[in-house]
């Protein structure tokens, strides 16, 4: 009888261990539950679009008015710029040119800006810029060239430390048909 009692207790303990083991998953939970990030918070695209367009206009006004401080605020320190003539420049060169007023104009209109929001910290804007009565001094010369006309632009903005700034800019002149004004 003792053997039977020992066997019954052993079977009971074995059964309890098996039941407990069955309650705990031997397989890792599905990764789609464990690895899925929480739903992203909604990006306020309207606010980003408004801020980027505001900065775009401030930048044009800064160049037009010779306001180097305003241009400094809009441009990131590491901005990469492709100018309408295909040359490249950096922030320091642009700020120096603005301070020296190497470019003058009656107006610089930003038309048809279209902002594409990539995420909460990155966006780009495309559009047209129209410069009226624009003149640019030729470096190392007393000559000026007429820069009046219509341009297409692509400017990339990034929010860093809570502040939006232009990190890349590219401007292309649009050829005008003879006798047409922008």
Per-region residue spans from a language model:
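Bacterial N-terminal signal peptides that target proteins for export
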Residues: 1-10
């Amino acid at each position: 009888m003792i053997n039977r009692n020992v066997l019954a207790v052993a079977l009971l303990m074995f059964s309890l261990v098996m039941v407990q083991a069955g309650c705990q998953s031997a397989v890792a939970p599905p990764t789609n539950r464990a690895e899925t990030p929480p739903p992203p918070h909604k990006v306020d695209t309207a606010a980003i679009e408004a801020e980027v367009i505001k900065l775009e206009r401030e930048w044009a006004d800064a160049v037009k008015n010779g306001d180097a401080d305003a241009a400094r605020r809009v441009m990131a320190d590491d901005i990469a710029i492709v100018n309408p003539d295909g040359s490249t420049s950096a922030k320091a060169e642009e700020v120096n040119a603005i301070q020296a007023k190497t470019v003058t104009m009656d107006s610089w209109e930003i038309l048809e800006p279209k902002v594409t929001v990539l995420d909460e910290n990155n966006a780009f804007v495309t559009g047209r810029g129209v410069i009226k009565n624009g003149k640019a001094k030729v470096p190392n010369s007393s000559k000026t060239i007429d820069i009046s006309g219509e341009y297409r632009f692509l400017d990339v903005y990034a929010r860093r430390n809570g502040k939006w700034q232009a990190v890349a800019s590219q401007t292309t002149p649009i050829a005008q048909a003879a006798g047409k004004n922008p």
